[in-house]
Every structure is written in structure tokens, then in C-alpha cells.
Amino acid sequence: MDISRAEQRILHLLAQGGRIELVRDDTRKIEKITLYTRDGWIFGGLDLLTFRKLKQKRAIASSGGKPYRITTRGLELVRGELDNR
């Protein structure tokens, strides 16, 4: 399954130890999505559409109310790059 360049970039950051945190409103709808790199920087290239695509492809998952992390399926989808850890 091919993934877009934006999805590839996000999965690459998550594979290096990043996380996606959500802020929800009172009706449990997503209000804000923030992608943090492993160094604590905020990556601004994640939007709701890309988040939903990655979730639909089961490349990211959250358990127990924790931030979203990359799954083993996501690791299979991400193409290897030299600076992956």
C-alpha cells in the first residue's frame, strides 16, 4: 500500500520516537492535533485529514488515553531512511 509524502514524513517522525496528542472539546470532537518530535519540537505539517488516513491504515494507534504512536503496521509502511533509529 502506497502512502503519500506527507504521511511518509509523519510516520518517519513517529518512528524516531515522536507522538501525536489530541485536544478534544466537550462533545469529544477533535479540536486540535499536535505532533511532537522526540526532541519536543512541534511539527506543523499534520492536519486532520492526514491523521484520519493514518488511523484508517492502522499505521498509528492510541491505547489507554495515551498519545498516538506508530504501530508495527506503520513501521512496515515507512520506508527506511538513513537517520531512522
From Swiss-Prot:
This is UPF0386 protein Atu1321. Disulfide bonds: none annotated. InterPro entries: YjhX_toxin. NCBIfam families: PRK13687.1 (NF010240). Belongs to the UPF0386 family. It comes from Agrobacterium fabrum (strain C58 / ATCC 33970) (Agrobacterium tumefaciens (strain C58)). Signal peptide: none annotated.
